[in-house]
Amino acid sequence: MTTRQICTLPRQCKLRKADEFRAVLRNRIVFESLSLRLYVKPIDVDYARIGLIVAKRVERKAVRRNRIKRLIREAFRRHRQMLMGLDCVMQLRHPVELLDSTRIYQEAVMLFNKAARQL
């Protein structure tokens, strides 16, 4: 039998409460790309956390909203080592085509790189 690596995002790496989101959004360290906006706040822990905002008015279909969130979570999971000690909130700014999933992933990675370099 082969062993399979579990590739999930731990629960501690997710922002869940409204107060946690508010704290990051109030901090106002912002990085932007064409369709995404990343809010960042330094924290005193040895891991990174992420929260996602994909509003219904920006993307009407739930399937698309969920797909976008999965792509961003995967980008975060793969690059969270460089974001240690940061709370991040990623927000979708404009509607995007579902076929542009590689672009969404690349923009998320670019914003994570930018935040890691500057903080």
Curated annotation (Swiss-Prot):
InterPro entries: Ribosomal_Su5_D2-typ_SF, Ribsml_uS5_D2-typ_fold_subgr, RNase_P
EC number in record: 3.1.26.5
Top EC class of this enzyme: hydrolase
Keyword Nuclease among record annotations: yes
GO cellular component terms listed in the entry, alphabetical order: ribonuclease P complex
Functional note: RNaseP catalyzes the removal of the 5'-leader sequence from pre-tRNA to produce the mature 5'-terminus. It can also cleave other RNA substrates such as 4.5S RNA. The protein component plays an auxiliary but essential role in vivo by binding to the 5'-leader sequence and broadening the substrate specificity of the ribozyme.
Family assignment from sequence similarity: Belongs to the RnpA family.
Protein name per the record: Ribonuclease P protein component
Organism, as annotated: Nitrosomonas europaea (strain ATCC 19718 / CIP 103999 / KCTC 2705 / NBRC 14298)
